[in-house]
Each structure stands twice: as structure tokens, then as C-alpha cells.
UniProtKB/Swiss-Prot annotation:
EC number of the protein: 1.14.14.3
Key words, A-Z: Flavoprotein, FMN, Luminescence, Monooxygenase, Oxidoreductase, Photoprotein
Gene Ontology molecular function: any one: alkanal monooxygenase (FMN-linked) activity
Reaction it catalyzes: a long-chain fatty aldehyde + FMNH2 + O2 = a long-chain fatty acid + hnu + FMN + H2O + 2 H(+)
SUBUNIT field: Heterodimer of an alpha and a beta chain.
Domain of life assignment: Bacteria
First-level EC class: oxidoreductase
GO biological process: bioluminescence
Organism name: Kryptophanaron alfredi symbiont
Annotated function: Light-emitting reaction in luminous bacteria. The specific role of the beta subunit is unknown, but it is absolutely required for bioluminescence activity.
UniProt similarity note: Belongs to the bacterial luciferase oxidoreductase family.
Protein name: Alkanal monooxygenase beta chain
Key word RNA-binding present: no
Amino acid sequence: MKFGLFFQNFLSENQSSE
């Protein structure tokens, strides 16, 4: 599912922000 990929990307970005 594309949604899963988008969600993972969002999480990855969130971690990068920290």
C-alpha cells in the first residue's frame, strides 16, 4: 500500500527532525 510508504516516510522525517 502506498499509504504505508507515506507513513514510514513521515516517521523517518519526524525522527530526522529530532
